[in-house]
C-alpha cells in the first residue's frame, strides 16, 4: 500500500514555513543555559516537534541560535526533551530522532523515505517486496517495514552503485528538498522517515523516543545490537 499523508512529501511541495522553526528569546536562553538547566520553553517546543517527527513530515530546522555555542551542549539541551540519548558510537541512521549541527554553513538534501517507497510501489513491486524482507544488520542498505500501521524506512551505509537496481537508483536520485543551513542551525529529523542524501561534517546526537520504531519485531534483535556496536 502507498504511504500517504505528510510523511510522503516531495521537495517542491514544501515551503520553509512548514519546516523551519525560528527560536524565540526564551527558548534561546534556556538552550544557552545548558542541558542541566530547567527548560519549560524547550519542553513546549519539543511538544510541537514530536508529532511532526513521529508521523508528520519527519524533520524540522531550528534557526536563531548563536553559532558560537558549544555544539554538544546545544544538542543535549534540545535532545533531553525529545528522547533518550544513545551511545556516541551508535548507528546514527538507526534511531528515532537525530539532531545535526553542521560545523560550518552547509547545503544538504533530504529525501522522504515514504516517497521513495511509493515510487518503487509504482515502478518495481518485486523490488519493494524484497526490501520489506531486507536485513539491515546483514548490510542491506535499504529496508522498509510497517508494524501496527506505522511505517519505517531504513537507509544505512552506502552500497556499491553497481549493486543498486535502476528503479531504486532513480527513486534515490529524486530532487528531494535542498536545505541551506546557516551557522547555529540545528536539523532535527526522524531517520526512519527522512533520509540524508549527503551528510555534512556535523556534530550529532542520536535519540530513542518513547514511541520508538527501534523495537519493530523484524529489526529489534539484530538492529539493537548494531546500534550499540556502531
Q: What are the roles of these predicted feature ranges?
A:
Residues 1-42, 55-60, 64-67, 82-230:
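Active-site environment of non-heme Fe oxygenases that use a 2-His-1-carboxylate facial triad
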Residues 43-48:
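Short alpha-helical segments and helix-capping/turn motifs at coil-helix boundaries
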Residues 49-54:
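Short, flexible, solvent-exposed loop/turn segments with mixed acidic/basic and small polar residues
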Residues 74-79, 168:
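Short amphipathic C-terminal alpha-helix that caps PH/PH-like domains
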Amino acid at each position: 500500500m502507498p504511504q500517504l499523508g505528510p510523511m510522503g512529501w516531495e521537495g517542491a511541495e514544501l515551503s520553509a514555513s512548514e519546516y523551519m522553526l525560528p527560536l524565540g528569546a526564551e527558548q534561546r536562553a534556556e538552550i544557552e543555559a545548558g542541558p542541566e538547566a530547567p527548560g519549560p520553553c524547550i519542553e513546549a517546543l519539543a511538544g510541537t516537534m514530536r508529532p511532526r517527527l513521529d508521523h508528520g513530515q519527519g524533520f524540522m530546522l531550528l534557526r536563531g541560535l548563536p553559532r558560537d555555542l558549544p555544539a554538544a551542549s546545544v544538542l543535549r539541551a534540545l535532545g533531553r526533551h525529545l528522547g533518550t540519548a544513545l551511545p556516541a558510537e551508535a548507528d546514527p541512521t538507526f534511531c528515532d530522532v537525530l539532531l545535526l549541527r553542521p560545523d560550518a554553513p552547509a547545503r544538504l538534501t533530504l529525501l522522504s523515505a515514504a516517497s521513495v517507497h511509493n515510487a518503487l510501489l509504482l515502478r518495481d513491486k518485486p523490488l519493494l517486496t524484497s526490501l520489506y524482507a531486507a536485513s539491515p544488520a546483514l548490510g542491506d542498505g535499504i529496508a522498509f517495514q510497517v508494524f501496527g500501521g506505522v511505517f519505517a524506512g531504513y537507509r544505512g551505509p552506502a552500497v556499491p552503485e553497481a549493486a543498486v537496481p535502476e528503479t531504486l537508483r532513480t527513486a534515490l536520485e529524486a530532487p528531494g528538498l535542498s536545505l541551506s543551513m546557516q551557522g547555529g542551525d540545528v536539523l532535527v529529523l526522524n531517520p526512519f522517515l527522512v533520509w540524508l542524501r549527503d551528510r555534512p561534517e556535523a556534530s550529532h546526537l542520536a535519540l530513542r523516543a518513547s514511541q520508538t520504531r527501534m523495537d519493530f519485531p523484524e529489526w529489534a534483535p539484530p538492529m539493537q545490537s548494531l546500534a550499540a556496536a556502531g
